[in-house]
Amino acid sequence: MLEQLRFPHEIAKDIAKQEKNKRKKRKLTQAELSARSGVSLASLKRFEQTGEISFVSLVKIAMVLD
């Protein structure tokens, strides 16, 4: 059972990977997603690389991609 436990940063990176895949599937650049979502380009890049993002920004991105 302990093998199933994951750390928050691992989950965050997985979410970032999923959102990046959605962005690419929709053929959006980071700049386009930034403009459509209202999330700064720097924040979006950091999110895709590290998984770090505010909850509000994550919701904004999800609203564009989902």
Sequence positions of predicted segments:
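A short, Lys/Arg-rich alpha-helix, primarily the initiator
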Residues: 1-25
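Helix-turn-helix DNA-binding elements, focusing on the entry/boundary residues of the two helices
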Residues: 19, 30, 41, 55-58
